[in-house]
Amino acid sequence: MADYLLYESATGYSLFDVVGADQIAAKTKEVQLSLQDISKFGKVVQLRSFIPFKNAAHALENANDISEGVLNDFLKNFLELNLPKASKKKKVSLGVQDKNLATSIKSEIDAIECDTSELTQDLLRGIRFHGDKLLKQLSPGDFERAQLGLGHSYSRAKVKFNVNRNDNMIIQAIAILDQLDKDINTFAMRMKEWYSWHFPELSKIVGDNYKYAVIVTLVGDKTTINDEMLHDLAAVVDDDKDIAQSIINAGKVSMGQDISEIDLENILSFAERVIKLSNYRKQLHNYLVQKMNVVAPNLAELIGEMVGARLISHAGSLTNLSKCPASTVQILGAEKALFRALKTRGNTPKYGIIYHSSFIGKAGAKNKGRISRFLANKCSIASRIDNFSDAPTTAFGQVLRRQVEERLNFFDTGVAPTRNSIAMAEAYEKALSSVNIDGDEEVDIDVEETVETISEKPSKKEKKDKKEKKKEKSKKKRSADDASEEVKKSKKKKKSH
């Protein structure tokens, strides 16, 4: 049972004396009942010392240290000044809420023995419940204001840990892109049905939705179409004058009905809306590509920006994706098929979101499962490198992509791919050359040594040779032992005769 209790609050550090430690330990149920009543609980613990924080920044610094289990100088000096000196026979017992902080206090101050038992937690819970009444130095409302301010600053610091590498923007961007694709297709279909009453031949000549919308705004009423529009129409259809001329010819002999000015205005405004949505979709796609190259450059280099963004979105974050094993990455997005297969005891799916990768499409029907497993393994490695590396670089992604291409070639031609140890050593060397390390004179990393250590692993042939040598040695030993036994037996026979 602890003799003293350390209470960390938003206002400062408090040290409490535990009155009647033996009686409290014997009556744990009564202590739990007395937690709600301040008149009873005030007799169990008494305030020994209190030290407030200097300002809000100092409180945030101490809160971060406590959350990480670090004993800073401010808390260490407070404990050394207010706790009594321990004797040789008995140490000072201090009740602490956090176990990590307790271990750091033990390692820093030998005279203190920390206690994190259930009874200590109950007493600290009571102090936290009656904190504003036990700390009489504070005026009413100070405790709540300090908690609110510290909570906001602590949460803000955690959220703004790294603004540039925020994967939440990728999740939102890919979701908006998918929704925009659906909306643009729906709006373009309605626009074609609407304008086809007036100019039905245009939808057969121009199939692209964006180009169709631009031509609708350019032509307007088909009765106004003439040969002077040839260059403007050709600019829309990739400078193809034949298509532009066919549009003009079809407009002159179109079988569509006439249209009023009000109807045409609504059609044109709707076509402009489709054009704006398409332009915004292109802009958002470029933003997503740039964001992926900042947040997950290796994953984007390996599997592409769109597929990589969908993997991050489906996993919930880049951190969650990096924690997933390769087998989980392989079937991300195919959960329904997986559970259906498990329920019916059928074949489980071979791939999920990674099916949209170009590597799966290039592989043959027999090798799709193999390449999906290999690709999922490399995606798992790339996501972990992106998540836990301080300086983003595409060196590992380029090497991993080349490994997948070599594996595809191996399935088709049988040419052996590069060994993984050699490829990773090459990527490591590229990463070191691309990242500017502060103090290059002090940092001395020999890539050749790392390659040697990686390549020191014996090959399969070497292992077989070693096994054969061991077998030969064991046979020789057995033959020598048998020969010695025969000699001994012959000697015994001679002595007996």
From Swiss-Prot:
GO molecular function, one term: snoRNA binding
Ribonucleoprotein as UniProt keyword: yes
SUPFAM superfamilies: Nop domain (SSF89124)
Source organism superkingdom: Eukaryota
InterPro entries: Nop56/Nop58 (IPR045056), NOP58/56_N (IPR012974), Nop_C (IPR042239), Nop_dom (IPR002687), Nop_dom_sf (IPR036070), NOSIC (IPR012976)
PROSITE patterns: NOP (PS51358)
Region (Disordered): 448-497
Subcellular locations according to the entry: Nucleus, Nucleolus
Start and end residues of each Nop domain: 295-413
Alphabetical UniProt keywords: Nucleus, Ribonucleoprotein, Ribosome biogenesis
Compositional bias annotation for Basic and acidic residues: 479-488
A GO cellular component annotation in the UniProt record: small nuclear ribonucleoprotein complex
Gene3D superfamilies in alphabetical order: 1.10.287.4070, Nop domain (1.10.246.90)
A Pfam cross-reference name: Nop
GO biological process, one term: snoRNA guided rRNA 2'-O-methylation
Subunit structure: Component of the ribosomal small subunit (SSU) processome.
Family to which the UniProt record says this protein belongs: Belongs to the NOP5/NOP56 family.
General function of this protein: Required for 60S ribosomal subunit synthesis.
Protein name from the UniProt record: Nucleolar protein 56
Originating species: Schizosaccharomyces pombe (strain 972 / ATCC 24843)
Gene encoding the protein: nop56
